[in-house]
Amino acid sequence: MVAASALAPMLLAGCATQPAYERPALATASAWDNDVRSVPAADTADLAEEAWWKSLGDPAIDTLVEAALVDNPTLGQAIARMDQARAAAGVSDAQRLPQISLNGSVTRARTGGTQAGSGTLTTTQSSATLGPGLSWELDLWGRLKETARAAEGRLDARTADAAQARLSLTGQIADAVLRLRACHFSLTVRERDIAARELELAVMRERLSHGNVAPVEPANAASNLAAARTDRISRQEACARIVNELVALGGRDASVVRTLVTPSPGGTALPPASLDRRSPLAPIAHVDADMIIPDPPPIALALPAATLLDHPAVVAAEREAAARWAEIGVARADRLPRVDLVGLLTGNWIRMLGSTSSFDTWSAGAELSAPLFDGGAGAANIRGAQARYREAVEALRDAVRTAARDVEDALAGQQSAQQRIATSREAVEAARVVLRANEARWRAGAISMFELEDSRRQFNAAQESAIAAARDRAQAWVALVRAAGGRVSMPAEAPTGSDIMNSHPDQGNAQQQ
């Protein structure tokens, strides 16, 4: 008895058919190539779990993300796949335990025959059996253990996939809202440009009626107006496509999306295209880019090794590799003998010839099965499992490289956008000075209205470039959070987008003199 009790854990634990899994060696850079402040991995927080998008301070993003997290088919599929993997892991764990079943049967039979001297003899018999049965596979070679490990690895992979789907969804919504805000501002610029060109065409036609210009001048003005209207139509289509994208992601109606995104995040609507009392057409009032596009707070990353290995896509690929490694052990164990403990306890009831009898039977033992000849199928299964593991390792290496590239691209984009913001603001200020000077010259009769309107268009275009740079900076910030898998550090003293907007409540109003 003592020997049996000592042997039982060994039988349950089994003999390993291969070494324990070790994560493949992954090459990562010692530091980020683009300039970024690195912090210890312990100081980074998982912003993916902390509603990172709220750091932008954009109510439209907050509302659409909240709707998408409860009603997005892609995310729902990822969660369903995670639940499937959890169920499969439960099945694999259950297979390592004894399987107990209840077996029973009821039969009634009649037999008849001819007996010498007594004629025909008919006998009716009724019988019933009922009892439990037990079957328990001894995991001698770790087949069941490796099967459970493979299922656990896939559960971890699907969990990471769900986290990646959630991060990707929230990032797509934030990116689309930023693009839609910039698109609306760009559309307003084109509306004002069309209004200016319509006035120019009217003036040209009036001058043509007095013989002051050649017919080619109104024709050129009409051509420019048609081109501007075509550009506006294309911009309207681009804005509509972004709205459709947000509808598909968040499940909200297009009208709701437009209502949410039309005002600026700071609550100030874009200036209307109304006429000015001092000139035929007023330029778009100066609007600070931070009032149209949220100014994201600064963030820091851990070193590449810590950041990349915690990325959900990398985690999913690594856990899939672990599952494939375990399946090699399963394939090896399938070629070895298998021992099952079986037991049966049956109660029997029989009635025949008017008498009834009942009795119990039991049996216990072990069943041995082993492949003798399979035509090489077992060896082929092992080679296939090994090839699938190598494929998973290469997928893991690719996931690390892709994540590193995405982080570096986002860092480069953020730096470029930050520099363009500075230069575009200088361009806006210079264009404003030129516009005000030309307005004064136009009132004094020193320049024509066409020269004035050209300076207006330059000012509007400079503002549009500033908004585009602010959009690119915010998009790069979103891309950086996504590329880092949400594992970033945000200084406690760093202001959020809403803090910056609330500190300048009057920005976005006209600042003309």
Residue spans of the language-model regions?
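Small/polar (Gly/Ser/Thr/Ala-rich) solvent-exposed segments
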Residues: G76, R96-T124, S135-Q164, C183, ...
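Hydrophobic, lipid-facing positions within transmembrane beta-strands of outer-membrane proteins
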Residues: A128-L134, A176, L303, W362-A366
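Terminal intrinsically disordered/low-complexity segments used for targeting and assembly
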Residues: M1-V70, E152, Q236-L309, W349-I350, ...
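A short glycine-centered flexible hinge/capping loop motif at secondary-structure junctions
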Residues: L208-N212, W442-A446, A483-R487
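Alpha-helical heptad-repeat coiled-coil segments that mediate oligomerization/polymerization in large
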Residues: G211-A214, A403, A410, G445-S448
